[in-house]
Amino acid sequence: MNNLVNVEMAGINDIDALVKMRLEYLIEDNGNLNDSEVIEIKRELPNYFKKHISNDLFIFVVREEQTIVACAFLLVIEKPMSPAFINGKTGTVLNVYTCPDYRHKGYARLIMETLLEEAKKLQLSVVDLKSTDDGYYLYKSVGFADDNSKYHLMKWKPDTLVQK
């Protein structure tokens, strides 16, 4: 890994590049998106970023020659306190992604280490993520553990979304 590489916090000026990175991540993770999904994401995601970056969404990036080549998102959520998150502040890691030509340089590890240092500064009680098989050992190596809970991970989705 290049020792001159720095992890930076992305800002409003990075939104176009972040939308591109998010789409690349989603396509790699989910397979091709349909045209209407791409259009919706390109239309709505910039507004989401404008509203949330540096408020409750912290995006860590690595650049090579001014181009973002790796990123990870830390979404901070405040919940009613419980023994599992005693101060109510939790984080969720999303969108850990390195462009294919820049993989195996240690960028994801560097970003995750920086992200977790920020989580400590933000006094998050716990940080969670969903891992692919490819990322599992990286996350274990920076301190994540399997969540052996008595609870089942479940979700609900409406049949259709109400359009704005």
Located regions from the model:
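A conserved beta-turn-beta hairpin within the catalytic core of GNAT-like acetyltransferases
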Residues: 78-93, 103, 149-150
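Conserved GNAT acetyl-CoA-binding A-motif
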Residues: 112, 119-131
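Conserved GNAT-fold acetyl-CoA-binding loop/helix
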Residues: 26-48
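Conserved catalytic-core motifs of GNAT/GCN5-like acyltransferases
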Residues: 76-82, 128-130, 140, 145-160
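A short helix-loop-beta-strand connector motif used in the catalytic cores of GNAT acetyltransferases and
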Residues: 47-61
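Conserved beta-strand in the GNAT
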Residues: 61, 67-76, 92, 97
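A short beta-loop-alpha structural element at the N-terminal edge
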Residues: 6-20
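Conserved acetyl-CoA pyrophosphate-binding loop and the N-cap/start of the following alpha-helix
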Residues: 102-114
